[in-house]
Amino acid sequence: MNINTMNKHTTNLNIIKNINNINNLNSIKELLLLLNNKRLNRSLNKTYIWDYLNELSNKGVKLQHLNNINSWSSQIYKFNKTEEINNTIYDRLVTKLLTKLLVLNINNKIYKLIISKPIFEHSINKVNIKFFYYLSYKNINKNINNNNNLINNIYSNYKFNINSKLINLLNNNINSISNILSLYYNKDVSFEPIQLKYNYMNSDILAKSLKIMNSSSKRSLSMNRIKNLMNNMPKLNDKLISQTYINNINNIMFNKYNNIIKSINNNNNNNPADSSPGNPRGGAAGKLYNIIYENNNINTIPNNILMFKYLVGWSIQLKGRLSNNKSISRSNTMNILNGTFQNYKYIWGNQMVNNYKLNYIPVNHNITNISDVNKNGKYNIKVKLNTI
């Protein structure tokens, strides 16, 4: 028997073992599913089922119900108090470090990226640092006269160069920032930069953009420039978006749990699953999948329940001496508001039902305060965004 024949024989044995393991696993899943169904049949009754569905319905109308830790700026695994304090100190230092270091040299031109406040995800063996950044192509089209195709081509190359240099600076090079920071954290460090197409998609980036606009302009932040910014930002119907979002979640949840309860009452005889090798969801997994999502389009569910897609309200507060006019008061304040910040379901209902007065949607606010000093004095920029 030659070596090739032995290798083929070994490969066939491994395939047979894998098939047997998969069949055993599917058999165990089938058994557990049947045991679970019998237990639920004994314990559930109609009154309990409807109470359970009503409770899920009330929880489902909260936009923040699916993601309660999205706004955390630091997620630390609490295994040691001293280590937790050290990680918090390092996180603050890294935040300042990234703001200073993210300056790239491309074609002998210096580009400074506008970044958001980083989000630190700590685990036992790794630290993942996530942040948003914004690229502006205004600097590359000053000498181009209304040639949109040329601007788009240059911007695409410019964006690719910056993205590749950014990844090399953070993660890939031997002397990258991640390798250096791993010596301080005593664990692997990785960066996850996320590019934003518009500066108004993050409050930190929008506030920093206003600060740069104020420092680079001879006229500072005039009302005309604020109006131009307002015209570029979207104006969405928050009532329609919120109601559509709530209806999508309610429909998905009611269909899913009604399908489960219906299958329990029918003893799983009405929804047979295809357990052939070509079916990726065969056996117990395929049966459970078909039961839960019988009346739902699985391809549209992620997009329907995706959060923070729409900006429905924003405000900008300018305080202090932003103007070049030296006679302006320090207490001068200008407030600009567009959209809404009150995402309450009962406001939009036709009937003021007492059951819905406490059933509100948590407001998703992103707030950033930035202070700086110019030649006339100190000023403050406060940006507040409401996303759904």
UniProtKB/Swiss-Prot annotation:
<dbReference type="InterPro" id="IPR007980">
    <property type="entry name" value="Ribosomal_uS3m_fun"/>
</dbReference>
<keyword id="KW-0689">Ribosomal protein</keyword>
<dbReference type="GO" id="GO:0005739">
    <property type="term" value="C:mitochondrion"/>
</dbReference>
<keyword id="KW-0496">Mitochondrion</keyword>
<dbReference type="GO" id="GO:0006412">
    <property type="term" value="P:translation"/>
</dbReference>
<keyword id="KW-0687">Ribonucleoprotein</keyword>
<comment type="similarity">
    <text>Belongs to the universal ribosomal protein uS3 family.</text>
</comment>
<dbReference type="Pfam" id="PF05316">
    <property type="entry name" value="VAR1"/>
</dbReference>
<protein>
    <recommendedName>
        <fullName>Small ribosomal subunit protein uS3m</fullName>
    </recommendedName>
</protein>
<dbReference type="GO" id="GO:1990904">
    <property type="term" value="C:ribonucleoprotein complex"/>
</dbReference>
<comment type="function">
    <text>Essential for mitochondrial protein synthesis and required for the maturation of small ribosomal subunits.</text>
</comment>
<dbReference type="GO" id="GO:0005840">
    <property type="term" value="C:ribosome"/>
</dbReference>
<dbReference type="GO" id="GO:0003735">
    <property type="term" value="F:structural constituent of ribosome"/>
</dbReference>
